[in-house]
Amino acid sequence: MIALIQRVKRADVQVGERTTGEIGAGLLALVCAERGDTEAAADKLLAKLLGYRVFSDAAGKMNLPVSNIDGAGRAGGLLLVSQFTLAADTNSGLRPSFTPAAPPEEGKRLFDYFVAAARERHPIVETGEFGADMQVSLVNDGPVTFWLQVRP
């Protein structure tokens, strides 16, 4: 599984005119299931995402996770957006191949599992809508962006 995470001041996702998710300071995570991924991979990626230290401590060092963005225990928001294009194979030609991505039904199942697990472990979780044409807006903080990937 893959997550492209961005530290944000705020972010939201819309489907048409409807806002499906919105957060203040926290992490926007574009999430993709690859062929062969399992719930164990989703759990491993979520643990990495929730524990990844990308927020600054009092000394200005990236040393705090999304569960404690200010060093005083305040949790940041987590906006999870499905994006199968992260699994694209771009090694040949001028058109990406999406064969490495999980099939839509499996991708949705794993994304829904990931979201449910995140909601059990983190107080502020918002989402996009799987398979929808979404408009994602964000104010990137830094910018700070990381590619997280785990194998099943």
Swiss-Prot record:
A motif (Gly-cisPro motif, important for rejection of L-amino acids) lies at residues 142-143. Its EC number is 3.1.1.96. It is an enzyme of class 3 (hydrolase). SUPFAM superfamilies: DTD-like. CDD domains: Dtyr_deacylase (cd00563). Pfam families: Tyr_Deacylase (PF02580). GO terms for biological process: D-amino acid catabolic process. It catalyses: glycyl-tRNA(Ala) + H2O = tRNA(Ala) + glycine + H(+); a D-aminoacyl-tRNA + H2O = a tRNA + a D-alpha-amino acid + H(+). GO terms for molecular function: D-tyrosyl-tRNA(Tyr) deacylase activity; Gly-tRNA(Ala) deacylase activity; Ser(Gly)-tRNA(Ala) hydrolase activity; tRNA binding. Homodimer. PANTHER family: D-AMINOACYL-TRNA DEACYLASE 1, D-TYROSYL-TRNA TYR DEACYLASE. This is D-aminoacyl-tRNA deacylase. The gene is dtd.
